[in-house]
Each structure stands twice: as C-alpha cells, then as structure tokens.
Amino acid sequence: MARPTKFRRVEFFPEDNYFVPWGKPKCQIEEMVLKVEELEAMRLKDIEKLNQEECAQKMEVSRQTFQNIIDSARNKVAIALTEGKAIKISGGNYTTKLCKYRCLDCENIYEINYKQDRDTCPACGSEKIVCSRKADFCRRWCKGHNK
C-alpha cells in the first residue's frame, strides 16, 4: 500500500492560470495540467535561483521529492511548448500555510495547515467558513474567499 501524498508548501499563486498557443482555435487545443506545486518548484529553482536543498526546505519535502516535482513540471512545460498545447495551472497536493479561515458561526479564525481546502470549522464543525485574508494573497485560489 502506497503512503499518502504529503502536502507541499506553496507561497506563490499566479494571477493567470491558463495559457494557450496563439492562433489555434480553443476547440483544437489539447491541454497539459501543471499542478500548483510544480509551478512553485520551477519558481523557486529557476526564478529565485535557490539550490535544491533550499527549495526542498521551502516546500517542506525531501530533496528527492523536490527533484521529482520539478522534473515533472519541466517535462509538462516542454511538451506543451513543443507540441502546441495549452497549459492549465490547477490542482495538486499543496498547502499555503498563509490563508486564514473564519467561521461565520463561532467566529473562530484558523490557518489552513494540513489541507488546501477546509470544508468545516475545526472548533464547531460548521460549513459556513470564509477566507479572512485582508491582503488578497490567495485571490481566487482559496475556497470561500471574501472579495
């Protein structure tokens, strides 16, 4: 039996999450799905210029897991670019540790620290929860975001 996938820490979410080749009708385009943590791995390594150990620490994974994530990401991007496919950034196994949720029933405020979406308040079990971030960091990525 395989171990459950550990959630990867992500600090960045792109404002745009869908990229298509110019000049192709949308109905003729296949898409590659790039997971949120795959984009984060490329950002840390290729833009922030961190070494593998630093990247792995930031994402709270082993160096081998980080290498697997970035290899998968680069493979998907290379295929999309060479074969004219769209890139959709979506899904994955990640946590922000940056969003705070607020329960509308009991007013409990808590961080998302082990799951990317919290469906119920850990204090009272209510499903009436909203994102309470004032800085608008998480934008549309966060379930129940207050606009």
UniProtKB/Swiss-Prot annotation:
Disulfide bonds: none annotated. Signal peptide: none annotated. InterPro entries: UPF0251. Belongs to the UPF0251 family. This is UPF0251 protein CTC_01373.
